[in-house]
Amino acid sequence: MPRINFIFGVHNHQPLGNFEWIIKRAYEKAYRPFLETLEEYPNMKVAVHISGVLVEWLERNRPEYIDLLKSLIKKGQVELVVAGFYEPILVAIPEEDRVEQIKLSKGWARKMGYEARGLWLTERVWEPELVKTLREAGIEYVILDDYHFMSAGLSKEELFWPYYTENGGEAIVVFPIDEKLRYLIPFRPVNETLEYLHSLADEDESKVAVFHDDGEKFGAWPGTHELVYERGWLKEFFDRISSDDKINLMLYSEYLSKFRPKGLVYLPIASYFEMSEWSLPARQAKLFFEFIKKLKELNLFEKYRIFVRGGIWKNFLYKYPEGNYMHKRMLMLSKLLRNNPTARIFVLRAQCNDAYWHGVFGGIYLPHIRRAVWRNLIKAHSYLEPENRVFDLDFDGGEEIMLENENFILVVKPHYGGAIFEMSSKKKYVNYLDVVARRWEHYHSLKDIPEGMKRELSYDKWPRGMLQDHFLLPTEVLDNYMLSKYRELGDFLMSSYHYQIEDKLRLWRSGKVKGISVEVEKVLRLNKDGFTTEYRIVSKEELGLMFGVEINLAVQGTVEYPAEFMSKEIEVKDIFGKVKIESEKEAKIWKFPIKTLSQSESGWDFVQQGVSYTFLYPIEKMLNIKLKFKESM
């Protein structure tokens, strides 16, 4: 009788730094009831991957889940599939770290009583060089999307077998996940999944259909708990799939012990199809979306889809400079702390992928997720002896200056207006400059955005830092400034400054303001409670303008509103504690929240990424300013 082998798998993950209540809700709505339901069906088999962040939470908070999982492994109902333990994008971290991450995951599986041989590839981000890594880490098979195989030229009919892939003389088995099953399960009636699997039944005993997708689909996603548990979808699915004569339930390891892969394929750099849209720069992503829409209107998409390719995951590091900077700080620390096992665990945690990219929801736009990465990066950095360094940290071709003492790490980009782009506290493990700029995203279609939000919507022309130098008309207003509708009269913001490092950092530049020659010099001194900066601005002619020093801070837990006032200081209170910025001279101060617009499960959301504070001083021919940034415990 024709039959189809069927492998069913779930991937459970929570981002580093996610809110406790979200993890608890996912546990109660998805992880716990799924495993308890599985226990009721002894003939049902599931391949399970759990990321390290979630593993650590479960071990601390829900040991009974771990015990139940161990029991199901012992009964042969569950096969553990591993990954990089803290869920990194493997191709985005050094080779040594890849192996270490996978071996950490394999070590946990061994503790659970299982010798794991298979790998769930995070976000299915594949590059051929991974073959060597995976083999070195003791991995025999890896699970990818069928899109990877179609991108290599395989037809849909050829996607129901695993294959070998080779690189540099090493080979590994690759299983394709069936896309149609991902859309059927659990959203469509069980009968539709059964009918589809029956349609695949074949006399070839080695034919296999693979479903492996997010475990959160089974209860944590909106509306799924009611569908999957209250309306009995999962029980019906387990009951019918495990008793169907035409369907042979298997685990990956069982399949490989019985059948050989179909042959040899060479897979290109790829992830799942949607990722190729999201990773493109916003304007190209919009064109890509329109192109797909046009193909669908012409009924050509399915026929020619294998030739439609967008961007690759690493494009996100180009698309979001803040993510790239965080990524390069991680690479720096990975290299410098290679032989420090205590510090390395913080580096490995900071490699958790979620904070480095953005699809439709969350990702880099979630401050609490970035904050957790920075916390671990700064903890790791604290194991290094403080020293000043000059090097191209973020691989943009310009040298960064890293000033450091026992309490702080301060990074200046002379080629980006001589501004500060990292101010990290070793006492509080916080980067005060963890601020993502406001950017246009390809899904920002104005017809969809609520009217009230449109009025606040604005996009930044440059990344946000500290000590960013503005020349403005005295009649300029805060409303224009915060909506990026003002006129910048100088050429200092994004231009290169000269620098000299002694016991202090001196930065200077000769530029133009309304065609007039102007020199700006700023001198930075790092001290035990923050830093001081002294400005000296000299113009060859009278300017009659305002000089503004902009300081952006990662104020993310206190809701702020635009304000204008006169003062010599501001005190900022947030989840990181208190900081104070003092000016020797009274200044007009502009304050406004930096809010990015992104989508969530509930619709559109503004997310406060930080707050901009600009100290404004009148300038004619000469101006001297002294500012202090002070951290309070």
Curated annotation (Swiss-Prot):
The keyword Hydrolase applies. Transmembrane segments: none annotated. GO terms for biological process: carbohydrate metabolic process. GO terms for molecular function: alpha-amylase activity; carbohydrate binding. Keywords: Carbohydrate metabolism, Glycosidase, Hydrolase. It catalyses: Endohydrolysis of (1->4)-alpha-D-glucosidic linkages in polysaccharides containing three or more (1->4)-alpha-linked D-glucose units. It is an enzyme of class 3 (hydrolase). The active site is at residues 123, 214. Pfam families: AmyA-A_glucT_m, AmyA-gluTrfs_C, Glyco_hydro_57. Its EC number is 3.2.1.1. Belongs to the glycosyl hydrolase 57 family. This is Alpha-amylase. The gene is amyA.
